[in-house]
Amino acid sequence: MQQLLNEILDEVRPLIGRGKVADYIPALAGVEPNQLGIAVYSRDGELFHAGDALRPFSIQSISKVFSLVQAIQHSGEDIWQRLGHEPSGQPFNSLVQLEFERGKPRNPFINAGALVICDINQSRFAAPAQSMRDFVRRLCGNPEVVSDSVVARSEYQHRSRNAAAAYLMKSFGNFHNDVEAVLLSYFHHCALRMSCVDLARAFCFLADKGFCKHSGEQVLNERQTKQVNAIMATSGLYDEAGNFAYRVGLPGKSGVGGGIIAVVPGRFTVCVWSPELNAAGNSLAGIAALEKLSERIGWSIF
């Protein structure tokens, strides 16, 4: 496995320079684009990694999975009264579909859906940002995971579209807490800094029927785990989920920080990071690396 990871990084490294680092979040625009890392973590606790897999980066929308899991833990099936679990087919920050469907987001991984999930968690936790940080620390076993306040502040200063979505949902009665407070929590979640190794470890419960072996925690039950993996498979890569299923064939979740987490149910989790994005906002070299890994090992679930 170690040799394979090294080979794959060598093969996809020439793609660096063909994508573009996210620049709509000013604090992310200065990230060094040449970085590339990958980590594989097995349900039995074996870890393999290569490249910049130990270097923390801004996880951005990957945090939406953690938020969803927290909401499921405390509110169960009730959350689906306020949002769906269908692919949207629209840009992740689109307002058109939200207006047409009367303030009920299609799924928890578009921005509007993630904001509803944060609104649910805001009602549950006295300090949502701290609760999320502590939850993630337990899952990955790294007490040093923190939220980058500079990135969070930068995102808050450029919050107009997310605020518009939140206020639109509030006008339809699907947003219960103070919008600005929820936005602050949401941006602190997105600004969490984790490495490929951290994320591969943190997501291992989704490869093991909801059980996190290194923390000893039953995070979700088996049915809930299948549901989260299913939503990742259909909606985890913005409006490129179909292409990812075609090329990689695994449940996954991406973020504009350049990270992608993928789950091989019953076996492994894989995290890859390369900051340069394609036109859909997903890591260009990251998808290529996951495609090669899935092909060579035969990991596709299809």
Swiss-Prot record:
Biological process according to GO: glutamate biosynthetic process; glutamine catabolic process
Top-level lineage group: Bacteria
UniProt EC number: 3.5.1.2
Reaction it catalyzes: L-glutamine + H2O = L-glutamate + NH4(+)
Molecular function terms, GO-annotated: glutaminase activity
Binding site for substrate: 61, 111, 155, 162, 186, 238, 256
A Pfam family recorded for this sequence: Glutaminase
Keywords linked to the UniProt accession: Hydrolase
InterPro entries with a match to the protein in the record: Beta-lactam/transpept-like, Glutaminase
PANTHER family in the record: GLUTAMINASE (PTHR12544:SF29)
Family of the protein in this entry: Belongs to the glutaminase family.
Binding partners and assembly: Homotetramer.
Annotated protein name in UniProt: Glutaminase
Organism for this UniProt entry: Pseudomonas aeruginosa (strain LESB58)
Gene designation: glsA
